[in-house]
Amino acid sequence: MRKLAIIGASGHGRVVADIARKNGYSEIVFLDDDENIHECGGYPVIGKSAEAGMIDADVIVGIGNASVRRRIQESIPDEKLIILIHPDAVVAEDIVIGTGTVVMAGTVINPGARIGKGCIINTCSCVDHDCEVGDYVHIAVGSHLCGTVSVGNGTWIGAGATVSNNVSICSNCMIGAGSVVVKDVPDNVTAFGSPAKVIK
């Protein structure tokens, strides 16, 4: 029997649970630090996030916030963490994906791509050939990285955004939904628009 503990009893966590079920996990439980939450999507909440290392189960962090996801994931032994890929994702054979990353339905990841740990590659997004995606990145619903794009750690690419070929987006950035990024973006900024411009 394959058992999975998902940290984060939320809407995102329910999506992760659905992917886990499709990957053959027959027992799914949640961990959450909110003592008022007792179930999520019909699955029981059995404890808090700090208990993840002690549970006899595989573990994945199902939390959208990158800084929280990173803090929790880095407290869990690597050997307990898994990668989840929806069976309807199209994933090239030679890609590299780090532990704790979730790849959702309809996603395309093309040859030569490298994706770090703890990432969310969300529904119907595209990571094209030879892209380098850092740790704890969120590629949101329907966003597209064209070929040879680089995305730094902790960056959030908003829903429906497009990043043009050979562009580098540095760490801890936020790219607004629907933006078109055609130039490099420095660390720790928010960029928005078509073409995207740094707004703070």
Which ranges hold each PLM region?
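Short amphipathic alpha-helical segments
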Residues: A17-A20, R71-S75, I115, P186-D187
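Short alpha-helical
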Residues: G11, S67-V68, V198
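Hydrophobic, well-ordered beta-alpha structural blocks that scaffold small-molecule cofactor pockets
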Residues: M1-S49, T101
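Structural signal for interior beta-strand "rungs" in well-ordered beta-sheet cores
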Residues: L84-F192, A196-I199
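Phosphate-bearing ligand-interacting subdomains
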Residues: N36-V91
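Short helix-capping segments at alpha-helix termini
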Residues: N23-Y25, P77-E79, K183
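Cofactor-binding loop segments of dinucleotide-utilizing enzymes, especially the Rossmann-like FAD-
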Residues: A9, D32-D33, G64, H86, ...
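Generic structural signal for conserved hydrophobic packing positions in ordered secondary structure
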Residues: G8, V59, L81, D128-H129
